A protein has these predicted regions:
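Short hydrophobic alpha-helices and adjacent helix-cap/hinge residues
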Residues: 1-147
């Protein structure tokens, strides 16, 4: 998730201090739990993102509430049926949603999609970003694919 940390560092206004991040997952869904494990391992005790430090916490999708207190939400694989609800909650709370599922971004449910194979590709949904009031620096937007 070092790529995700870079994405967060390009948000405007810049985030400073602790940047709470929810890892949304579906308990009992192997793919979702495996991705949540991988995110936790890669983030460890916290990852620097510009002047901020991303600190993650697992949140079962059924218990996400309003995502109050979170600035970022990692949307794991296996949550397609929940993406519409996640998007609505994230938009109300101005939470930056990041997923490895390209369909989440294409549908406008996630703000950022990160693919790492065959090469790194970052996609930003203008509609999801606008709905959640998420803005990025112009230098970042020149490096990514906007849809």
């Amino acid at each position: 998730m070092p790529i995700a940390a870079r994405v967060v560092s390009f948000t405007l206004p810049a985030r400073a201090g602790a940047v709470p991040a929810a890892i949304l997952f579906a308990p009992g869904n192997e793919a979702s739990e495996a991705e949540a494990d991988a995110i936790e391992r890669s983030m460890g005790a916290g990852v620097s993102a510009g002047r901020g430090t991303i600190r993650t916490r697992r949140v079962p999708v059924g218990s996400m509430g309003a995502l109050t207190g979170y600035q970022v939400a990692f949307v794991t694989t296996g949550l397609r049926g929940e993406q519409d609800n996640i998007s609505a909650v994230a938009a109300r709370s101005s939470v930056l949603t990041i997923s490895s599922d390209p369909a989440c971004v294409q549908a406008g449910h996630c703000v950022v999609g990160i693919a790492t194979s065959p090469r790194v590709q970052i996609t930003v949904s203008r509609a999801a970003a606008r709905a959640a009031n998420i803005r990025f620096g112009s230098a970042f937007l020149m490096l990514v694919k906007e849809i």
